A protein has these predicted regions:
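Helical scaffold of the NTase/Pol beta-like nucleotidyltransferase catalytic core
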Residues: 1-37
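Active-site nucleotide-donor binding segment shared across nucleotidyl transfer reactions
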Residues: 24-66
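Short amphipathic alpha-helices in soluble, non-transmembrane regions
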Residues: 67-75
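Conserved catalytic core of two-metal-ion nucleotidyltransferases
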Residues: 77-110
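Catalytic cores of NTP-dependent nucleotidyl/adenyl transfer enzymes across multiple folds
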Residues: 104, 111-171
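C-terminal binding/interaction regions
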Residues: 173-191, 239-295
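Short beta-strand scaffold segments in enzyme catalytic cores
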Residues: 195-205
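Compact, glycine-rich, soluble single-domain proteins
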Residues: 214-228
Length: 295
């Protein structure tokens, strides 16, 4: 039987369904998973959609994803390889009445990762286009309830137009920094008294380069935070001007830099430290600025 195409009004439960499925996916991908995102129409509040949860994962190694095909099948996924897009791994769940789709790319594949995030973020912030897209999809679903090819072809022109517009306005710098930080974040047991990698950080310099670092934890408080490690890498490479900073905990959440690190940056850039942006909430893209630390 062909897939039955239905387009329904936005459902707040879609976000919860994404979160539940993301936990299962991260458990299977384990340390190979760098980042995971809710994408597609169900990720856009207020947008009517087919009730299918689209999920994108960025990984370090696609071959390890292939090795996990059996594990995905155990939670109901059909593993379809690239499925028409080079460098992707595509999985779907639910058969003809599909419920979830996963699109997996390596972290270096910014073209594919970026276009998905750009389209999503644009739709989240542009109501006129969001409403127009919803109308197009509802009309097509009524006209072609069992013809997915006609449904997709019917909205292709609009999607490509919006994707081009979205990419022209998209600043994916925070996303690139997040991926760079997560890509080096893994626990390293260096000795019985020293471990590293629980927290990672990325900084963007005034020259547009990204430097990363991981925390070093010791038994006697002689370690180094991830932010200062990233700054050390920047200075080693002959730069000293910071524009943005993101620190990430072991659960993938953005965290503010510690007081000592903030004070260090005010000394590094005494006349310009207040212009350094720090990411406070990566999922919702909320950021702030460095303020002088007072103990």
């Amino acid at each position: 039987m062909s897939q039955h195409i239905t387009v329904v009004d936005y459902n707040p439960l879609w976000a919860k369904k994404y979160e539940e499925e993301a936990l299962l996916i991260k458990d299977i991908l384990a340390d190979n998973c760098v980042a995971i995102y809710h994408i597609g129409s169900t990720s856009v509040e207020g947008l009517a959609a087919k009730p299918i949860i689209d999920i994108m994962a960025a990984v370090q190694n696609l071959e390890k994803v292939d090795d996990a095909a059996e594990a995905f099948s155990k939670i109901g996924y059909e593993y379809l390889g690239e499925f028409g897009i080079a460098g992707r791994r595509y999985l779907r769940k639910g058969g003809d009445e599909r419920t979830h789709q996963i699109h997996i790319f390596q972290t270096e594949d910014w073209n594919n990762i970026g276009r998905h995030l750009a389209f999503r973020d644009y739709m989240r912030t542009h109501k006129k286009e969001r409403d127009e897209y919803a109308k197009i999809k509802k009309v097509l679903a009524q006209k072609f309830p069992y013809d997915i090819d006609e449904y997709c072809d019917g909205k292709e022109e609009f999607v490509r137009k919006i994707e081009k517009l979205a990419l022209s306005q998209f600043d994916g710098t925070w996303d690139k920094m997040y991926l760079a930080a997560r890509n080096v974040q893994k626990k390293r047991e260096i000795s019985p008294l020293v471990e590293a990698g629980g927290v990672s950080a990325a900084i963007l310099t005034e020259k547009g380069n990204i430097y990363v670092g991981v925390c070093i934890d010791t038994a006697c408080s002689l370690g180094m935070c991830a932010e200062r490690n990233a700054i050390a890498n920047m200075i080693t490479n002959g730069e000293n001007g910071i524009c943005r900073l993101i620190a990430v905990d072991r659960n993938g959440k953005a965290i503010p830099p510690c007081g000592a690190c903030r004070e260090f940056m005010t000394q590094l850039m005494p006349d310009h430290y207040h212009s350094i942006q720090i990411m406070l909430d990566y999922e919702n893209k909320k950021n702030g600025y460095i303020r002088r630390y007072h103990s």
